[in-house]
Amino acid sequence: MTQSLADMRRDYTRDGLTEAQAPAEPFALFHQWFAEAVKTEQAPVEANAMTLATVDADGRPHCRILLLKGLDEQGFTFFTNYESAKGQHLAANPFAAMTFFWPTLERQVRIEGRVVKVTPEESDAYYQVRPLGSRLGAWASPQSRVINGRGELEDLLKATEQRFTDTQPHCPEHWGGYRLLPERVEFWQGRASRLHDRLNYRVQGADWILERLAP
């Protein structure tokens, strides 16, 4: 390693985030930041990529990267195999956290809350607009289970293709969406000297409380 990890750092130079810029609820600010990220971030960064953290039945945390596929006044939506590891975690502990990081904008958003399944109709609507290969893959892959090499997965895909030779695949019952209902949303804006801006929204009854956190 040519550079010590202790010496690896970058300076943050963009404008800060003030309470005057923060609306009464976090969704409007997320929409604004997300729109700016879509315009600004370039490959390999995907603006809707996020880290999803879940906790299993033994209290052990697990993280992975996946894509945000829906956002409305209720919450943040993603889709997956309900029988996957994350699906099993959410069945045992229906709380999760998301983190978005947009390096060009020097911004991060952390979201925490309860997770619920979306309706079968909503899952099917999204499933039908996915590429054919992805729709077949949702049937073929026993997600998170141990398999005997890549060949087994390719054999499963071939069998699935044959199954749906004469018909379009429909949404499997074991596949669909989850919606995270936010209880806490923190907006982080990088600032000089590591004195970052952190504005935190938290639910209190039917209202959102806005607070500034020390960096």
UniProtKB/Swiss-Prot annotation:
Pfam families: PNP_phzG_C, PNPOx_N. It comes from the Bacteria. PROSITE patterns: PYRIDOX_OXIDASE. One of its GO terms (molecular function) is pyridoxamine phosphate oxidase activity. SUPFAM superfamilies: FMN-binding split barrel. One of its GO terms (biological process) is pyridoxine biosynthetic process. Pathway: Cofactor metabolism; pyridoxal 5'-phosphate salvage; pyridoxal 5'-phosphate from pyridoxamine 5'-phosphate: step 1/1; Cofactor metabolism; pyridoxal 5'-phosphate salvage; pyridoxal 5'-phosphate from pyridoxine 5'-phosphate: step 1/1. Its EC number is 1.4.3.5. It catalyses: pyridoxamine 5'-phosphate + O2 + H2O = pyridoxal 5'-phosphate + H2O2 + NH4(+); pyridoxine 5'-phosphate + O2 = pyridoxal 5'-phosphate + H2O2. Binds 1 FMN per subunit. Keywords: Flavoprotein, FMN, Oxidoreductase, Pyridoxine biosynthesis. Substrate binds at R9, R10, D11, Y12, K69, Y126, R130, S134, R194, L195, H196. InterPro entries: Pyridox_Oxase (IPR000659), Pyridox_Oxase_CS (IPR019740), Pyridox_Oxase_N (IPR011576), Pyridoxamine_oxidase_dimer_C (IPR019576), Split_barrel_FMN-bd (IPR012349). FMN binds at R64, I65, L66, L67, L68, K69, F79, T80, K86, Q108, Q143, S144, W188, R198. Gene3D superfamilies: Electron Transport, Fmn-binding Protein, Chain A. Its cofactor is FMN. Homodimer. Catalyzes the oxidation of either pyridoxine 5'-phosphate (PNP) or pyridoxamine 5'-phosphate (PMP) into pyridoxal 5'-phosphate (PLP). HAMAP family: PdxH. NCBIfam families: pdxH (TIGR00558), PRK05679.1 (NF004231). Belongs to the pyridoxamine 5'-phosphate oxidase family. This is Pyridoxine/pyridoxamine 5'-phosphate oxidase. It comes from Pseudomonas fluorescens (strain Pf0-1). The gene is pdxH.
